[in-house]
Amino acid sequence: MLKILVIDRCHFTRTGIEALLNHSGRFSSSFLVSGINNLLLAKEHILQWKPHLVIADLNSFISETHSSPPINPFFMSCGVIPLILLQSADRQHAPIAPSQSVAHSVLTKHTTLNTLSHTIQEALQVRPALEIPKNATPLLTPQEEKVLSMWMDGVSNNAIAAALSIHGKTVYTYKRNIRMKLHLGNRFSPFLSLPGKGD
């Protein structure tokens, strides 16, 4: 089972790529797809989970971040892992110009599904010889991903507990597990570089 990490602020892009990989019938391999909407957490996610391919729209983070986003640490964490960069054609900022040694391909989000599928197949063929586990597991459980998403949106623990129908103490446990898995130093770590946080 091949592990693919999709990094994009857009929920529809993350779920759409997962549907393309797992439900379109275009691929013969089986995939475990993990989606993340936070560039700050992407580096640790890559280092801990070791995906076989990373697909990312970095422009969405640049346009929404007032301070400089952690682009270079992101590229360094990818290392030899193939990277497909997606770019929104309707954005009004300068595109990211990664070195050719870093990105396998740069595509717009208006690329056809055939082209995207072909590019993914190519990237997976040139990937480094990483161990392919028979039963891969995501770094975060689906429930932890929900808690992280709401936590990043600034939702209170009580509201998270109510939304997920869990006890308030369970929210603390999930947050502790997320911090341990992503090697975050303290409970405020996910918010250190987000605009408007900590002011």
From Swiss-Prot:
One of its GO terms (molecular function) is DNA binding. GO terms for biological process: phosphorelay signal transduction system; regulation of DNA-templated transcription. PROSITE patterns: HTH_LUXR_1, HTH_LUXR_2, RESPONSE_REGULATORY. The keyword Repressor applies. Residues 133-198 form the HTH luxR-type domain. InterPro entries: Sig_transdc_resp-reg_C-effctor (IPR016032), Sig_transdc_resp-reg_receiver (IPR001789), Tscrpt_reg_LuxR_C (IPR000792), WalR-like (IPR039420). Coiled coil: none annotated. The modification 4-aspartylphosphate is found at D8. Signal peptide: none annotated. Keywords: DNA-binding, Phosphoprotein, Repressor, Transcription, Transcription regulation. The keyword Repressor applies. Residues 157-176 bind DNA. Residues 3-124 form the Response regulatory domain. May serve to repress the entericidin locus in C.freundii. This is Transcriptional regulatory protein EntR. It comes from Citrobacter freundii. The gene is ecnR.
